[in-house]
Amino acid sequence: MLPFDPSTRYDRQVRLWGEEGQASIGSTSACVLGSDSLATEILKSLVLAGVQSFYVVDDAKVEQADIGQNFFLHADDIGRSRAEATLEKLTELNPSVSGSASSQPPTALAMEDVEKLTTFSVVVAANQNEEIDTTFAKVLYNIRVPFICIKTFGLIGTIRICIKEHTIANSHEENPRPDLRLDAPFSKLIEMINETNLDEMTLEQLRHTPYILLHFKALEVFRKQRNDPEAFPSTTAERKELQAILMSFRRSSEESGTKDSENFDEAKAAVIRAFQRTTIGSSVKSILSSPQCSTSTRPFWLICEALRRFVTENNNLLPLRGTLPDMTSDSSRYTRLATLFHEKALSDAQEVLRLTREVEKERGVGDVISDDVCYRFCKNADRIRVQYGDVLDYNEETKAIVEKIRESNIDEETRNQKVDEATWMLLMRAVGRFQKEKGRYPGTNGVPVSIDAQDLKKRVEVLIREALKDEQDFTSISNKVTDTAIAEICRFGAAELHVISSYVGGIAAQEIIKLATNQYVPIDNTFIFDGHTQESATFKF
């Protein structure tokens, strides 16, 4: 048997979130409440991703209906503990992942073994009732363990992330602006700019000059024309003027007579993105001004305090990212530029590390931030984020949902063909209320859909009235929740459609990985998928 090599097994994942991200996944322990098809689809994706361990909690036994809904169960599993049966199959997917199961009711874990909950990186409730959801949400919110409620009901799926605070070390912003510091060049870069004389270059040298140097040379002319050493193009007209200066540097080829040159085309195309003031984004500003920077001993906030001090001491600039975009150039000048940027980024990171050691000493903690962590943090300093959440409160969320329905513009001609996502959210709340009061879900136990639809409609109306301060809005809002939609959710009969479980479970696992790696931005905080239209929406409650 070949030795296990994480970098080989998880090669594609490592390309997404790096070795440090995979290491975070490898230390993640997940507790999943439930073992139905939704739970196993979530766990399947986590096990294949390489989490350290998982723990399944469910007191259900395998029944005939489970065999048709869950690919991880077989006919000979009927009568067995469903948690144990799914555990058996899931651990076969990845031998490096350990798993365990408990046949106790999920509520017992929240009421009797809170200390055990603190050992998990995340707790997931798969198709649990509202009482279990709210019980775990309150306990886990206070001990800062992320809690995710996931439900599927027929063609509808929802995900609700409950977390007190989630820190993001790299949001992986799409198409980030290059950090070239055109308005604030560092000393070594200034030396190279001053050494560059376009007039003395041969045509071949000019056509292989990196466009960042062309930008700086065009900026010099731009400033001379204005007799202002601090001038910087900030309007469309000024950037067009700078583009014209750039293109005036071109020379004609004696052979072809044309001025075509790839590096000048790149320089012109990059002007809009490159010529932006080097500023700190609002998200990072709010983090650096947070009281947590001054008091917290958690690693993220320790290094954020060091970053805040660095910014204060360095003209309100973040550490240099240290990477260059691809550009046409000869190898010697591009290598020199890349080296200058890398060395400056390393120097900035070392200064942040020094400040971090100061903060650690002041707060009475050990060296919790390693050199590598500090360097990665500084490289992505403009992409740090923090999300804050509230404890799960279904009653408060219902008020927000009803307000969304009030604000929605529903087309009278198509309202029976397409149901608004907020309406589905309200119907899912009504389903939860129905289950709590009747001990079963609408459309089950052989009760005709028409009867349960009438019962469910009454609960929808009660929820709307509870959420409203003014009764006069009741009719207009309740009319937006059509009888067709109510009958449809009853028609589902609490069915678990594997295709919906697989899709929603995959998204949920992706969100868990975001929480585990502290990379990418998780859903904030509610997601709903409508299988009728294959459309989804997010809400912040």
UniProtKB/Swiss-Prot annotation:
Q: Name one Pfam family in it.
A: ThiF
Query: SUPFAM superfamilies in the record, alphabetically?
Result: Activating enzymes of the ubiquitin-like proteins
Keywords, A to Z, come to:
Ubl conjugation pathway
Q: Which GO terms describe its molecular function?
A: NEDD8 activating enzyme activity
**What phenotype has been reported when the gene encoding this protein is knocked out?**
RNAi-mediated knockdown causes the formation of an everted vulva in the L4 stage, with the subsequent rupture of the animal during the L4-to-adult molt. Loss of rfl-1 nuclear localization in a 1- to 2-cell embryonic stages.
Sorted alphabetically, the Gene Ontology BP terms of this entry are: negative regulation of DNA damage response, signal transduction by p53 class mediator; protein neddylation
Pathway the protein contributes to:
Protein modification; protein neddylation
Q: What do the Gene Ontology cellular component annotations say?
A: cytoplasm
Q: Which family does it belong to?
A: Belongs to the ubiquitin-activating E1 family. ULA1 subfamily.
**What is the purpose of this protein?**
Regulatory subunit of the dimeric uba-3-ula-1 E1 enzyme. E1 activates NEDD8 by first adenylating its C-terminal glycine residue with ATP, thereafter linking this residue to the side chain of the catalytic cysteine, yielding a NEDD8-rfl-1 (uba-3) thioester and free AMP. E1 finally transfers NEDD8 to the catalytic cysteine of ubc-12. Required for rfl-1 (uba-3) nuclear localization during early embryonic development.
How would you summarize the oligomeric state and partners of this protein? Heterodimer of uba-3 and ula-1. The complex binds NEDD8 and ubc-12.
Q: What is this protein called?
A: NEDD8-activating enzyme E1 regulatory subunit
Gene symbol of the encoding locus: ula-1
